[in-house]
């Protein structure tokens, strides 16, 4: 028995006590013999305590008030609540000339601080002291900006930090909360209809008038007249000019039967036509261009005129201008044109030619003119007069 104990519980020799000791494994013996393993529950590391589940159901309120039906989880809470209905206030203030009664002892404790002036609760933001914790919590809303008490009237919606302030504010309202809610709903409905109507695009006054064909508006491409080429328009203009000046001995600017050739008539006729001016005019549109005030070379002149000039009416020069030139003729300058024989149009006698060009002109000198051939062109000098 003793040998078995020594084997189970060995001790080192005195000489080996001074040597470094080897710490054996918990489950190993000195000779390498393994002991039965220990239960893991004995040396397992401690587990952290679990926090209570937030979704856990609160304790059932088994104690209900017989007067108002309010439930409580503890009997003591129910007994304190019943004092509200019975009017029992067992806690009385012993301060002289006070005698106030309270249902709870905590309420009496807070009341006594009114007499003593004690304010143990202090604000950590501004350092203001308070006698109770509820007053300090109400004061903290000033710094945090929380206003939990809201006016129930829909047309007001003001918020307050204290319930008493909200109650005092509600006394100024007239009517019920339901009436205020209905009035607010009607106002919101009218505002939504007005916003939707203003968001719709409306036609401007210019768009409404444009349907009547205003002369100052730009017509659509379907209403515009087809534009002709510049060469065709100029050819038509030249033809009209030749037609106006035909069979007349007066130039175009002195004739009274051609009212359309004047600039004023041209300007007025351009705006009185049915073609409306556009931002992209196609030459002159359907109206003819303004005619040139110079006499045309195609005009047929009489035998006693020199290109229709009133100053050369006495010259007996038969002008061949009654024959149209090939460049401006209707045939377009074809090869069938034949120039007239000069013998039939001009006199062959040189003296007659000189008389035709100069004799008539000598009689047309202006009085006081210094041109050659004038009778008063030569004036004697002063020294010649003395010599004479």
Curated annotation (Swiss-Prot):
Induction per the UniProt record: Methylation at position A1935 within the 3'UTR of ZAP1 mRNA is regulated by both the MTA1 methyltransferase and zhe ALKBH demethylase, and controls its stability and subsequent translation.
Disulfide topology: none
SMART domains assigned: ZnF_C2H2
Knockout or disruption consequences: Leads to a slower growth rate and a significantly reduced sporulation. Also significantly reduces virulence on chestnut stems and red Fuji apples.
Region feature (Disordered): 1-58, 191-350, 363-388
Zinc finger annotations (C2H2-type) as residue ranges: 63-85, 91-115, 121-143, 149-173
GO CC terms of this entry: chromatin; nucleus; transcription regulator complex
GO molecular function: DNA-binding transcription factor activity, RNA polymerase II-specific; RNA polymerase II cis-regulatory region sequence-specific DNA binding; zinc ion binding
UniProt entry keywords in alphabetical sequence: Metal-binding, Nucleus, Repeat, Transcription, Transcription regulation, Virulence, Zinc, Zinc-finger
Matching PANTHER family: FINGER DOMAIN PROTEIN, PUTATIVE (AFU_ORTHOLOGUE AFUA_4G10380)-RELATED, TRANSCRIPTIONAL REPRESSOR PROTEIN YY
Family of this protein: Belongs to the krueppel C2H2-type zinc-finger protein family.
Protein name per UniProt: C2H2-type transcription factor ZAP1
Name of the encoding gene: ZAP1
């Amino acid at each position: 028995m003793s040998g078995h104990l020594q084997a189970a519980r060995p001790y080192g020799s005195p000489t080996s006590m001074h040597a470094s000791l080897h710490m054996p494994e918990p489950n190993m013996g000195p000779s390498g013999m393994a002991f039965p393993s220990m239960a893991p529950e004995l040396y397992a590391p401690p587990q952290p305590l679990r926090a209570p589940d937030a979704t856990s159901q609160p304790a059932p309120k088994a104690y209900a008030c017989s007067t108002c039906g309010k439930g409580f989880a503890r009997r003591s809470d129910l007994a304190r609540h019943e004092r509200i209905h019975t009017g029992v206030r067992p806690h009385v203030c012993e301060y002289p000339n006070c005698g106030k009664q309270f249902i709870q002892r905590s309420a009496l404790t807070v009341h006594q601080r009114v007499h003593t002036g004690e304010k143990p609760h202090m604000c950590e933001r501004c350092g203001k002291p308070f006698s109770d914790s509820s007053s300090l919590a109400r004061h903290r809303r000033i710094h945090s900006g929380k206003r939990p008490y809201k006016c129930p009237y829909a047309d007001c919606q003001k918020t307050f930090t204290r319930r008493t302030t909200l109650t005092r504010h509600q006394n100024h309202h007239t009517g019920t909360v339901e009436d205020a809610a209905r009035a607010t709903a009607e106002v919101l409905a009218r505002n939504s209809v007005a916003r939707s109507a203003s968001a719709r695009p409306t036609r401007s006054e210019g768009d409404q008038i444009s349907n009547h064909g205003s002369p100052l508006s730009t017509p659509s491409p379907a209403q515009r007249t087809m534009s002709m080429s510049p060469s065709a328009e100029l050819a038509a203009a030249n033809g009209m000019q030749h037609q106006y000046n035909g069979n007349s001995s007066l130039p175009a600017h002195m004739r009274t039967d051609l009212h359309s050739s004047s600039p004023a008539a041209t300007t007025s006729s351009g705006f009185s036509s049915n073609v409306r001016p556009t931002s992209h005019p196609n030459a002159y549109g359907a109206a003819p261009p303004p005619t040139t005030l110079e006499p045309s070379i195609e005009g047929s002149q009489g035998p006693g005129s020199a290109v229709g000039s009133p100053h050369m009416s006495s010259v007996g020069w038969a002008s061949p201008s009654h024959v149209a030139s090939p460049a401006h003729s209707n045939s377009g300058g074809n090869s069938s044109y034949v120039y007239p024989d000069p013998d039939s149009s001009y006199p062959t006698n040189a003296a007659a030619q000189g008389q035709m060009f100069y004799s008539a002109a000598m009689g047309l000198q202006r009085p006081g003119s210094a041109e050659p051939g004038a009778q008063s062109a030569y004036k004697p000098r002063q020294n010649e007069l003395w010599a004479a």
